[in-house]
A protein has these predicted regions:
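Generic hydrophobic, amphipathic alpha-helix propensity
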Residues: 1-3, 19, 29, 44-48, ...
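Amphipathic alpha-helical packing segments from all-alpha helical-bundle domains
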Residues: 75, 79-92, 100-126, 136-140, ...
Length: 192
């Protein structure tokens, strides 16, 4: 019920009494389960991550060829972002004006910065990064490229399909981060 309320009107104050009423349970039941409105919002974020299968992104990133692993992870991310777009967008919009929702939004991004740092280090170790790009710069660029907010801007602002968004983001990554191969092309992963 919380997902539906939030997606329907993201900037409305989604209250525990309304959620309890629409779920046909007592308000005290919601408090017993979640502890607070913030707890409910964080549980919603956890559900979004689990239901969306976001663990698949991490699995993809562990592939031996870092470029190919990143490409696969981006394909997975675009699929998941599109599946969970209404609730993710609503939660992130509400987070700008609601402290309880901001905790939930932070949960959605938990670990992504560190993960992108590790990815940038692997790119450096495998000789993928351009010489003029530091690991720290690469991590920052990857952090922006992999965010839901970046996906949403291209999806809605440029009216692109999820596949097109992924292609644009991978193109940006190649041109910004990857060194040229001996034949003047950019790294593209062993599978391409």
């Amino acid at each position: 019920m919380t997902r539906e309320l939030l997606a329907r009107a993201p900037l409305e104050n989604v209250s525990l009494p309304e959620i309890a009423s629409r779920s046909d349970v007592a308000r005290s039941t919601v408090y017993t389960i979640f502890g607070s409105r913030e707890g409910l919002m964080v549980a919603l974020a956890e559900d979004l991550l689990e239901r969306g299968g976001f663990a698949r992104i991490g699995q993809a990133l562990r592939g031996p060829d870092v470029v190919r692993a990143f490409e696969i992870s981006m394909d997975v991310a675009m699929e998941l972002y599109s599946q969970e777009e209404p609730v993710s967008q609503a939660l992130l919009s509400l987070a700008a004006v609601d402290r309880d929702a901001s905790s939930a939004a932070a949960r959605l991004n938990f670990g992504r910065a560190q993960g992108m740092r590790r990815l940038a280090e692997r790119m450096h170790e495998q000789g993928v990064l351009r010489d003029d790009v530091t690991v720290e710069e690469a991590a920052d660029i990857l952090w922006v490229i992999t965010s839901f907010e970046t996906y949403a801007q291209l999806r809605r602002g440029r009216n692109l399909t999820p596949t097109q968004v992924g292609e644009r983001l991978l193109g940006m990554t190649r041109r910004t981060l990857y060194r040229e191969t001996g034949d003047g092309r950019r790294e593209t992963g062993s599978g391409k």
